[in-house]
Amino acid sequence: MELGLTGLRVMVSAGAAGIGLAIARAFVREGARVSVCDVDAAALAALAQSDASLHAAACDVSQRDEVVHWFEGALAHLGGLDCLINNAGIAGPTGKVDAIDPEAWDRCIAVDLTGPFNCVRLAVPALRASTNASIVNVSSLAGRLGFALRTPYAAAKWGVIGLMRSLAVELGPDNIRVNALLPGIVAGERQHRVLTAKAQARGVSFEDVEKSAFAGTSIKQYVTAEQLADYVVFLASRRAATISGQALSVCGDTNMLS
Protein backbone atom coordinates (compact mmCIF):
# COMPACT_ATOMS: atom_id res chain seq x y z
CA MET A 1 0.00 0.00 0.00
CA GLU A 2 1.42 3.36 -1.03
CA LEU A 3 1.05 5.78 1.89
CA GLY A 4 2.49 8.87 0.22
CA LEU A 5 4.65 9.93 3.17
CA THR A 6 7.69 11.09 1.21
CA GLY A 7 8.89 14.37 2.71
CA LEU A 8 6.49 14.20 5.67
CA ARG A 9 8.00 16.03 8.65
CA VAL A 10 7.69 13.96 11.82
CA MET A 11 8.70 14.32 15.47
CA VAL A 12 8.81 11.23 17.71
CA SER A 13 9.38 11.43 21.45
CA ALA A 14 11.39 8.61 23.07
CA GLY A 15 12.49 7.61 19.59
CA ALA A 16 15.93 6.17 20.25
CA ALA A 17 14.85 2.69 21.30
CA GLY A 18 11.91 0.30 21.54
CA ILE A 19 8.55 1.34 20.11
CA GLY A 20 9.74 4.86 19.35
CA LEU A 21 12.71 3.65 17.34
CA ALA A 22 10.50 1.24 15.39
CA ILE A 23 8.15 4.14 14.61
CA ALA A 24 10.99 6.44 13.55
CA ARG A 25 12.49 3.80 11.27
CA ALA A 26 9.10 3.00 9.74
CA PHE A 27 8.66 6.66 8.82
CA VAL A 28 12.18 6.84 7.36
CA ARG A 29 11.43 3.78 5.20
CA GLU A 30 8.38 5.62 3.87
CA GLY A 31 10.53 8.60 2.89
CA ALA A 32 9.61 10.87 5.80
CA ARG A 33 12.01 13.26 7.53
CA VAL A 34 12.22 12.52 11.24
CA SER A 35 13.37 14.11 14.47
CA VAL A 36 13.51 12.07 17.66
CA CYS A 37 14.18 12.91 21.28
CA ASP A 38 15.14 10.65 24.15
CA VAL A 39 16.55 10.74 27.68
CA ASP A 40 18.97 7.91 26.88
CA ALA A 41 22.21 9.53 25.72
CA ALA A 42 23.81 6.20 24.80
CA ALA A 43 20.83 5.19 22.66
CA LEU A 44 20.87 8.59 20.94
CA ALA A 45 24.57 8.22 20.17
CA ALA A 46 24.02 4.75 18.74
CA LEU A 47 21.15 6.05 16.64
CA ALA A 48 23.24 8.90 15.26
CA GLN A 49 25.91 6.36 14.27
CA SER A 50 23.42 4.06 12.55
CA ASP A 51 21.23 6.58 10.73
CA ALA A 52 22.57 10.01 9.86
CA SER A 53 19.24 11.00 8.30
CA LEU A 54 17.56 11.28 11.71
CA HIS A 55 17.69 14.49 13.72
CA ALA A 56 18.11 13.63 17.40
CA ALA A 57 18.11 15.59 20.65
CA ALA A 58 18.35 14.80 24.35
CA CYS A 59 15.05 15.67 26.01
CA ASP A 60 12.97 14.71 29.04
CA VAL A 61 9.41 15.53 27.95
CA SER A 62 8.40 16.34 31.52
CA GLN A 63 10.84 19.28 31.47
CA ARG A 64 9.34 22.17 29.49
CA ASP A 65 12.66 23.89 28.82
CA GLU A 66 14.07 20.70 27.31
CA VAL A 67 10.97 20.26 25.15
CA VAL A 68 11.35 23.84 23.90
CA HIS A 69 14.98 23.12 22.99
CA TRP A 70 14.00 19.96 21.09
CA PHE A 71 11.26 21.74 19.17
CA GLU A 72 13.46 24.67 18.24
CA GLY A 73 16.08 22.36 16.77
CA ALA A 74 13.61 19.98 15.13
CA LEU A 75 11.49 22.65 13.48
CA ALA A 76 14.59 24.39 12.15
CA HIS A 77 15.93 21.09 10.80
CA LEU A 78 12.63 19.87 9.32
CA GLY A 79 11.37 23.23 8.11
CA GLY A 80 7.98 22.70 9.74
CA LEU A 81 5.91 19.86 11.12
CA ASP A 82 3.24 17.50 9.79
CA CYS A 83 3.05 14.80 12.46
CA LEU A 84 3.77 14.55 16.19
CA ILE A 85 4.10 11.14 17.83
CA ASN A 86 3.79 11.34 21.61
CA ASN A 87 5.49 8.08 22.49
CA ALA A 88 7.51 8.90 25.61
CA GLY A 89 6.39 7.15 28.76
CA ILE A 90 7.58 5.30 31.83
CA ALA A 91 6.14 2.26 33.55
CA GLY A 92 5.87 3.92 36.93
CA PRO A 93 5.82 2.03 40.23
CA THR A 94 4.28 -1.39 40.74
CA GLY A 95 2.54 -2.04 44.04
CA LYS A 96 -0.57 -1.58 46.14
CA VAL A 97 -1.86 1.97 46.13
CA ASP A 98 -1.22 2.55 49.84
CA ALA A 99 2.43 1.57 49.35
CA ILE A 100 3.13 3.82 46.35
CA ASP A 101 5.60 6.64 46.92
CA PRO A 102 3.87 9.96 46.07
CA GLU A 103 7.02 11.13 44.30
CA ALA A 104 6.88 8.05 42.06
CA TRP A 105 3.23 8.92 41.30
CA ASP A 106 4.20 12.50 40.42
CA ARG A 107 7.00 11.34 38.15
CA CYS A 108 4.76 8.92 36.27
CA ILE A 109 2.08 11.56 35.68
CA ALA A 110 4.72 14.14 34.70
CA VAL A 111 6.21 11.96 31.96
CA ASP A 112 3.19 10.00 30.76
CA LEU A 113 0.53 12.74 30.78
CA THR A 114 2.12 16.17 31.21
CA GLY A 115 4.82 15.20 28.71
CA PRO A 116 2.38 14.83 25.80
CA PHE A 117 0.78 18.16 26.76
CA ASN A 118 4.19 19.85 26.77
CA CYS A 119 4.80 18.60 23.23
CA VAL A 120 1.32 19.27 21.86
CA ARG A 121 1.22 22.90 22.93
CA LEU A 122 4.39 23.58 20.93
CA ALA A 123 3.43 21.39 17.97
CA VAL A 124 0.00 22.84 17.25
CA PRO A 125 1.12 26.22 15.80
CA ALA A 126 3.37 24.39 13.31
CA LEU A 127 0.75 21.75 12.53
CA ARG A 128 -1.79 24.42 11.60
CA ALA A 129 0.43 25.29 8.64
CA SER A 130 0.50 21.68 7.39
CA THR A 131 -1.76 20.24 4.69
CA ASN A 132 -1.61 16.76 6.27
CA ALA A 133 -1.44 17.31 10.02
CA SER A 134 -1.81 14.65 12.67
CA ILE A 135 -0.98 13.75 16.25
CA VAL A 136 -0.73 10.19 17.53
CA ASN A 137 -0.56 9.61 21.28
CA VAL A 138 0.80 6.25 22.34
CA SER A 139 -1.39 5.37 25.32
CA SER A 140 -1.94 1.82 26.54
CA LEU A 141 -4.61 -0.77 27.07
CA ALA A 142 -4.26 0.43 30.67
CA GLY A 143 -5.96 3.59 29.40
CA ARG A 144 -9.12 1.56 28.73
CA LEU A 145 -9.13 -1.03 31.52
CA GLY A 146 -8.46 -1.05 35.24
CA PHE A 147 -4.98 -2.25 36.18
CA ALA A 148 -4.31 -3.53 39.69
CA LEU A 149 -0.88 -2.67 41.14
CA ARG A 150 -0.27 -0.18 38.31
CA THR A 151 -2.49 2.71 39.47
CA PRO A 152 -0.20 5.64 38.49
CA TYR A 153 0.43 4.25 35.01
CA ALA A 154 -3.23 3.48 34.36
CA ALA A 155 -4.36 6.90 35.61
CA ALA A 156 -1.86 8.63 33.32
CA LYS A 157 -2.83 6.55 30.29
CA TRP A 158 -6.55 7.17 30.87
CA GLY A 159 -5.60 10.84 30.94
CA VAL A 160 -3.85 10.51 27.59
CA ILE A 161 -7.12 9.24 26.08
CA GLY A 162 -8.98 12.22 27.52
CA LEU A 163 -6.32 14.55 26.13
CA MET A 164 -6.63 12.92 22.71
CA ARG A 165 -10.42 13.13 22.56
CA SER A 166 -10.48 16.76 23.65
CA LEU A 167 -7.77 17.72 21.17
CA ALA A 168 -9.58 15.93 18.35
CA VAL A 169 -12.64 18.12 18.95
CA GLU A 170 -10.62 21.29 19.45
CA LEU A 171 -8.22 20.85 16.54
CA GLY A 172 -10.58 19.27 14.02
CA PRO A 173 -11.56 22.67 12.59
CA ASP A 174 -7.84 23.21 11.89
CA ASN A 175 -7.75 19.91 9.95
CA ILE A 176 -5.47 18.33 12.54
CA ARG A 177 -6.29 14.68 13.20
CA VAL A 178 -5.66 13.35 16.71
CA ASN A 179 -5.73 9.67 17.62
CA ALA A 180 -4.34 7.33 20.24
CA LEU A 181 -2.82 3.88 20.00
CA LEU A 182 -3.49 1.44 22.85
CA PRO A 183 -0.87 -1.32 22.82
CA GLY A 184 -1.51 -4.48 24.77
CA ILE A 185 1.32 -6.70 26.00
CA VAL A 186 4.33 -5.50 24.01
CA ALA A 187 7.42 -7.64 23.53
CA GLY A 188 10.63 -6.17 24.89
CA GLU A 189 12.82 -5.38 27.85
CA ARG A 190 10.37 -2.96 29.45
CA GLN A 191 7.56 -5.53 29.51
CA HIS A 192 9.95 -8.03 31.07
CA ARG A 193 10.80 -5.51 33.81
CA VAL A 194 7.11 -4.83 34.49
CA LEU A 195 6.22 -8.52 34.75
CA THR A 196 9.25 -9.15 36.96
CA ALA A 197 8.22 -6.34 39.32
CA LYS A 198 4.67 -7.68 39.45
CA ALA A 199 5.94 -11.19 40.23
CA GLN A 200 7.96 -9.78 43.10
CA ALA A 201 5.00 -7.75 44.39
CA ARG A 202 2.78 -10.85 44.36
CA GLY A 203 5.41 -13.28 45.57
CA VAL A 204 4.99 -15.59 42.58
CA SER A 205 7.12 -16.69 39.63
CA PHE A 206 7.65 -14.72 36.42
CA GLU A 207 6.01 -17.55 34.48
CA ASP A 208 2.88 -17.36 36.64
CA VAL A 209 2.59 -13.61 36.10
CA GLU A 210 3.14 -13.97 32.36
CA LYS A 211 0.42 -16.63 32.15
CA SER A 212 -1.93 -14.41 34.16
CA ALA A 213 -1.19 -11.45 31.88
CA PHE A 214 -2.45 -13.38 28.86
CA ALA A 215 -5.45 -14.90 30.65
CA GLY A 216 -7.81 -12.19 29.44
CA THR A 217 -6.44 -12.15 25.88
CA SER A 218 -7.91 -14.03 22.92
CA ILE A 219 -4.73 -13.99 20.81
CA LYS A 220 -2.08 -15.06 23.28
CA GLN A 221 1.02 -13.53 21.77
CA TYR A 222 3.06 -10.41 22.36
CA VAL A 223 2.45 -7.31 20.26
CA THR A 224 5.64 -6.23 18.48
CA ALA A 225 7.00 -2.71 18.14
CA GLU A 226 6.97 -3.13 14.37
CA GLN A 227 3.24 -3.90 14.34
CA LEU A 228 2.58 -0.73 16.32
CA ALA A 229 4.77 1.30 13.97
CA ASP A 230 2.72 0.11 10.99
CA TYR A 231 -0.45 1.47 12.60
CA VAL A 232 1.20 4.80 13.38
CA VAL A 233 2.47 5.45 9.86
CA PHE A 234 -0.98 4.61 8.48
CA LEU A 235 -2.61 7.10 10.86
CA ALA A 236 -0.17 9.76 9.65
CA SER A 237 -1.06 9.17 6.01
CA ARG A 238 -3.81 10.72 3.90
CA ARG A 239 -5.47 7.29 3.81
CA ALA A 240 -6.50 8.09 7.40
CA ALA A 241 -7.82 11.53 6.45
CA THR A 242 -11.16 11.07 8.25
CA ILE A 243 -9.91 9.08 11.25
CA SER A 244 -9.75 11.29 14.34
CA GLY A 245 -10.71 11.07 17.99
CA GLN A 246 -10.14 7.31 18.00
CA ALA A 247 -8.49 5.10 20.61
CA LEU A 248 -7.26 2.13 18.59
CA SER A 249 -6.46 -1.02 20.57
CA VAL A 250 -3.67 -3.28 19.31
CA CYS A 251 -3.91 -5.95 21.95
CA GLY A 252 -4.97 -9.37 20.68
CA ASP A 253 -8.50 -8.73 22.03
CA THR A 254 -7.54 -8.21 25.65
CA ASN A 255 -10.53 -7.68 27.92
CA MET A 256 -8.86 -7.83 31.33
CA LEU A 257 -5.50 -6.76 32.73
CA SER A 258 -4.02 -8.67 35.62
Where are these regions (language model features)?
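Short, small/polar-rich loop/turn modules that mediate ligand/substrate recognition or access, typified
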Residues: G172, R177, I243-G245
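Active-site helix of classical SDR
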Residues: V120, A156, M164
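Residue(s) in the substrate-gating loop at a strand-loop-helix junction
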Residues: S140
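C-terminal helical subdomain
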Residues: A180, V204-I243, V250-G252
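The beta1-alpha1 cofactor-binding region of Rossmann-like NAD(H)/NADP(H)-dependent oxidoreductases
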Residues: A41, A57-H69, P102
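Short C-terminal tail/terminal secondary-structure segment
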Residues: M1-E2, A91-T94, L145, Q221, ...
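Substrate-binding pocket helix/loop in short-chain dehydrogenase/reductase
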Residues: G95-V97, D101-I109, A213
